[in-house]
A protein has these predicted regions:
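Short beta-strand segments within Ig-like beta-sandwich modules, predominantly Fibronectin type-III
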Residues: 36-42, 165-167
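Structured interaction patches on ligand/partner-binding surfaces of diverse proteins
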Residues: 41-42, 62-95, 99, 132, ...
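Short Pro-Gly-centered beta-turn/loop motif in secreted/extracellular proteins
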Residues: 45-56, 62-63, 123
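Substrate-binding/active-site clefts of carbohydrate-active enzymes
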Residues: 199-205, 215-456, 460-461, 482, ...
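Structural recognition of the beta-strand scaffold that forms the well-ordered cores
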Residues: 206-211, 261-266, 290, 295-298, ...
Length: 689
């Protein structure tokens, strides 16, 4: 949620006076597809590497009193006035890749931007834990006043410790767990191990996001499919071997977290070869992540076979877990050497390359971008590729990319012409692709094919829902049609397989969208990823009562809009890992408290539950967020995992957590609230740190 001055003044008025947080200055550097934020220290320069391109800078967390900053442009070595209490947003265009310094002068509240003349040493950003006012737990027994929530004689059980207490004279007395981060989770005793009193609702969904390639390799026989290589270095952008069989093998682990749905990164066939990784071309970058599609109708061999997906759906459903596939409709994958050779697209100077083009490696004076020297980007033979009736691309005879969200080439990827009413035929190389299900259909448009290819996964396998990539870059009418077609496909699959369940569910990614209702919900979306909460997690992990305003705001908004469902997260593949911010297992545990008690659905990124470390990333930071899932844990991480399991299962037992009425209970020594949905009622207490 972007905050304006009015919103901030209202939130300030609602905040608990005794728990006002200290100001924490923050710089967010964002592109159209990802972002990263950094702590700003007064009078200490922040040096970060930036590649050529356009960015949006947001400076927030500045306290004090100051006049509103005027409209201004960023100029080198020129102080820029900042707002107090209201974020300052500035466009930034970088012409030359390099290291850049941001100097915040707290005394006069300005930011100065400087290009570093020498390369700065690589810095690990570890934030100081926010200095916020917070309740303090002195140890021993605590007394909680619950007279307004439960009648005398009611037996309650703390999910964290297993203690059973009885409400007497409106109060309960118990000793919190020393390892819970000050958290007490009270539920009626008879429901502590029982089925939920309310049916499942996606507003309480706990969604586990798996990047399939980096999760678990259960079938090494499919590694290196299509002639893909390791690089023998840090393996930043290569396939690591994770597959669908690996997800199946770890379903019990996923279930133990109270998971309701698994969001799989895209598993359809990806481009076979590499492109250069990072601005400097320092590593070969393959489509291990799944967002560079070659064929939308088949599973990539690195990830497995149809039988594996069938088994995964069956075994997940047996555990009460739904399967969400990641659907990409905005763009196709890059033209790599491997694909150009296989598909006989005659735009390459073959004598410059080895017999198998994907075996190419840069020489000592080249980098991984240098393969472009063998490709003729002015050749008329590019018509043999996707073709100008299918995509926008900077190629001869193709429609030029535009500047709008709909017509731009996102990250230089070929942009499907989903708005075109023209009937098209799939390119010949795709019709000839081994194992493809693509067939030419009379009078089909680009959007017709893409909708059919995506919904066919639902019809064949009983997929429960989609996570939709890059929503704002495709027309709303296309999303409405996809939702209708997928809904019909799931109903047909269930009829054929004698099954029932919730209607097809669609979650969208609209970059920067917060926990509010927007017209995107009229385009078939049941939920949107909530980009608002990630930075609020810092203070919430430092002290849970700092989430009071967030919880109150979200719960009120959910009550006002019955079709609204924000999906909140703390880590993602396009931003950062929460653990990387503080490198603190205690903060990771406390962040679980803040996230899993948030109204609305929540998303756990694989490894959040064991504080997964970032991997190597060269000059592309977001590669580090896709590190391999660790499967061996020391005692401290096992304790962290146990905490996530206890909290996740508590949330799963009680749909009131995500979907219920939220009401605070005033206490002198704790932050306490109830969540109620029909007969389902729980009390959450934070007694301090």
């Amino acid at each position: 949620m972007k905050l304006n001055a009015l919103t901030l003044s209202l939130l300030s008025a609602l905040a608990l006076p005794a728990l006002a947080s200290a100001s924490t200055a923050n710089l967010t550097v964002a592109t159209t597809t990802n972002s990263r934020d950094f702590p700003l220290q007064a009078d200490e320069p922040l040096v970060i590497p930036l590649t050529k391109g356009d960015y949006t800078l947001t400076i927030s967390g500045i306290g004090g009193d100051c006049p509103p900053a005027p409209e201004q442009e960023i100029k080198f070595n020129t102080p820029i006035a900042l707002n107090c209490h209201v974020p300052t947003q500035l466009p930034l265009s970088i012409r030359f890749t390099g290291d850049y310094a941001f100097q915040w002068q707290a005394q006069n509240n300005t930011l100065t931007f400087v290009r570093q003349t020498t390369k700065a040493a690589k810095t690990e950003f570890r934030r100081p834990i926010p200095n916020v006012s917070c309740e303090v737990y002195q140890g021993g027994e605590v007394t909680l006043d619950l007279a307004s929530s439960f009648a005398d004689g009611t037996e309650l059980q703390d999910a964290m410790t297993g203690q059973v207490v009885t409400v007497e004279q409106g109060k309960v007395r118990l000793t919190p767990s020393a390892n819970s981060g000050g958290l007490v989770l009270l539920e009626p005793k008879q429901t502590a191990k029982a089925e939920p009193k309310q049916p499942f609702t996606y507003r309480n969904a706990n969604i586990y996001f798996v990047m399939v390639d980096r999760f678990y390799n259960a079938d090494p026989s499919n590694d290196g499919s299509y002639g893909r290589h390791k690089d023998g270095q840090e393996e930043i952008g290569t396939f690591h071997g994770g597959d669908l069989k690996g997800v199946i093998a770890k379903l019990d682990h996923i279930q133990s977290l109270g998971t309701d749905a698994i969001w799989l990164s895209p598993i359809v066939e990806q481009v076979h070869g590499f492109v250069g990784g990072g601005e400097k071309g320092s590593f070969p970058f393959y489509a291990y992540h799944g967002y560079w599609t070659r064929d939308f109708t088949k599973i990539d061999a690195n990830f497995g076979k149809d039988e594996d997906l069938q088994t995964l759906v069956r075994e997940a459903h047996r555990r009460g877990i739904k399967i969400l596939m990641d659907a990409v409709i905005n763009h196709a994958g890059y033209a790599t050497l491997a694909d150009l050779q296989q598909d006989a697209v005659l735009v390459v100077n073959a004598p410059m390359l080895p017999e198998r083009w994907n075996d190419w490696k840069p020489s000592a004076d080249e980098n991984w971008h240098s393969f472009h020297q063998a490709i003729d980007y002015q050749s008329k033979n590019w018509q043999q590729w996707w073709g100008p009736d299918w995509v926008r691309a900077g190629l001869p005879g193709y429609p030029a990319p535009g500047s709008s969200d709909i017509t731009m080439n996102l990250a230089g990827l070929p942009d499907f012409r989903t708005e075109s009413p023209q009937a098209v035929t799939p390119p010949q190389w795709l019709l000839n692709n081994p194992g493809t299900r693509v067939v030419s259909k009379p009078n089909y448009t680009v959007a017709d094919y893409l909708i059919e290819w995506q919904s066919d996964w639902v019809r064949r396998f009983g997929i429960d829902g989609f996570r939709i990539d890059t929503v704002k870059h495709v027309e709303g009418e296309v999303w409405q049609r996809l939702k209708q077609r997928a809904t019909e496909s799931l109903a047909a699959w269930r009829k054929d397989n004698n099954q029932s369940g919730e209607p097809f569910w669609m979650m969208g990614e609209v970059w920067g969208h917060g926990a509010y209702r927007s017209p995107y919900f009229d385009d078939g979306f049941d939920a949107l990823i909530n980009f608002d909460i990630q930075k609020r997690m810092d203070n919430g992990a430092a002290c849970l009562s700092q989430m009071a305003m967030v919880y109150r705001d979200y719960a009120q908004t959910l009550a006002k809009y019955p079709d609204l469902n924000p999906v909140s997260y703390m880590s993602s593949h396009d931003t950062e890992l929460f653990f990387g911010r503080f490198k603190s297992l205690d903060m990771q545990r406390n962040a679980a408290n803040a996230l899993l008690l948030t109204p609305g659905a929540i998303q756990v990124y694989y490894g959040d539950e064991v504080a997964r470390e970032a991997g190597p990333y060269a000059d592309d930071f977001h590669q580090g967020t896709r590190s391999d899932m660790p499967w061996e844990w020391n005692a401290e991480r096992q304790a962290l995992l146990k905490h996530w399991q206890t909290l996740g299962q508590f949330r799963q037992r009680h749909p009131a957590i995500g979907a219920g009425d939220h009401r605070e209970i005033a206490q002198s020594n704790a932050y306490v609230f109830t969540r109620t949905l029909g007969e389902d009622k729980v009390v959450v207490a934070f007694v301090g740190r």
